[in-house]
Amino acid sequence: MKKIAIILVVSLCCLQSVLAQDGTKMEAENANYSNCKLINDKKYSGGKALELTDENARINFSYQAPERGKYTIHVGYDALYGPKMVNVTVNGSTFSFQTGNTVMEEAEVGTFFMNQGANSIVITPSWTWFRIDYIRIEKGGSTLEFDIAANPVDTHASDAARTLYTFLYENFGKKTISGIMTGDMTTANGNVTQHADVQAVYKASGKYPALVGFDFMNATGKSGNSSWNKSYTTASIKLAEDTYKRGGIPAFTWHWRDPSRRTDAFYTADCNMKITDAMNADGTWNTSSALYANIIKDIDTVADYFLSMQSKGMACVFRPLHEASGGWFWWGREGAVPFVKLYRLVYDEMVNVKGVHNVIWIWNAGENDRDWNPGDNYYDVVSADIYNNDFDYSSNYVSFDKLKTLTKGKKIIALSENGPIPDIEREFEEEAVWSWWMPWYQTWNGKFVDKTSTAEWKKCMNDSRVITLNDLAGWDVYATIEIPTATNATRQEIYDLQGRRLFSVPSKGFYIMNGKKFLK
């Protein structure tokens, strides 16, 4: 008691740090704050809270960590008038979380790396009009281990898709695949290394990205049959084919234009498209409706492009219905239940009806999107879209950990859209090794390559833990082989693509060959 009394006399701020190390609370009113209103009310811890109604409001806690490591931060808040977005910045790395509708609640924000000694924890509003009561810090984080399936969810996946999935599976946690999104399609003439967006990465780093993003946004919709739209999609497919031929990974997104054909829009604000307009009152699909017919027609159009690539022995990754929980695209307008039904319809129509088996499926999720999960059997990879401030090379490990928890460690995790690239040292140091990252395009005045410095581009792209197109010898050097069951045999013979015997293996299963390396 004497020691505590001395601390109280010296500094209340120091008491905050000592108590927090024991997992207790740090009161908001005892932190350094500005542009906040102090609220006196006995319902709050300590009888006080800070109200954030000013967009410039700021609460800065100083936490003395006993050692470097992971710490889980909880925030006690009062949402006042419904859900709000709250920013929590730890030593310069920002993570945003959404409050619930509950008036007073404690939220687990996430697990953060902290240094031994002083650490800055800053709370600011993304949306105003809420109150912060306290934060609570606990040592340690999730101990969840990865347990990822060795095969894609499509049980009839093509050899090319199995090979691609195995490539992602074997490299996950060991290396990160570099990527770039493409926008403009008026140049390059089918040579992906000459595309302006790919060239921007090459000019900044001296190497080409291994994964290249394309968009089906002009393949369907009210103007889908226009010559310009068709030429855009055709150019994209040619570049995807060239990417694959060079050993790279084509990654497709689909900004799905209004299937009702009333507009050419995909943003919620620009169209009235509702998924439920194609459903019966009981939530089943109204298969006789015109809207349902248009939805199927659009899905089949995209499926046919995949089938064309499938016939050429290609495989791709595909991220349909992205960023749904944000609500800014029509497929997220009505919430999780209609979204899940639409995602499953896209998958079932493509895979089970059309026979598309050359796709690795991505569910693009928010960190707390449990209700939006289409089901573990409908996707291979979970991904996040994160745009840090320019030249902020954070690993975004909080989001990585959230997605790991969301999928119970059973899925590969990718950064499917980003601004600045994550620093490779921080990815490994902070245990957030994304399967791949993909900055948005440089063309169309996007300039997303410029949001990473040339020095950082060179550092990351020349690191042995980052896979570039320069590192890949081409998919024809890989072979995925199903070993037949042999009742009396103890080993199975392995041959290369030219029929030459390489060696034997002791068991049946799917194997992948990469040069001299042989993996099960």
Regions found by a protein language model. Give the residues of each.
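N-terminal module-boundary/linker segments of secreted carbohydrate-active enzymes
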Residues: 138-211, 217, 226-230
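C-terminal outer-membrane/trafficking sorting elements
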Residues: 479-520
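Extracytoplasmic
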Residues: 21-172
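Aromatic- and acid-rich polysaccharide-binding/catalytic face
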Residues: 369-391, 440
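Bacterial Sec-dependent N-terminal signal peptides
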Residues: 1-21
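Substrate-binding cleft of secreted/luminal carbohydrate-active enzymes
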Residues: 411-478
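Aromatic-lined carbohydrate-recognition surfaces of secreted/lumenal glycan-active proteins
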Residues: 319-320, 343, 347-368, 411-420
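Substrate-binding cleft of extracellular glycoside hydrolase catalytic domains
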Residues: 222-345, 356
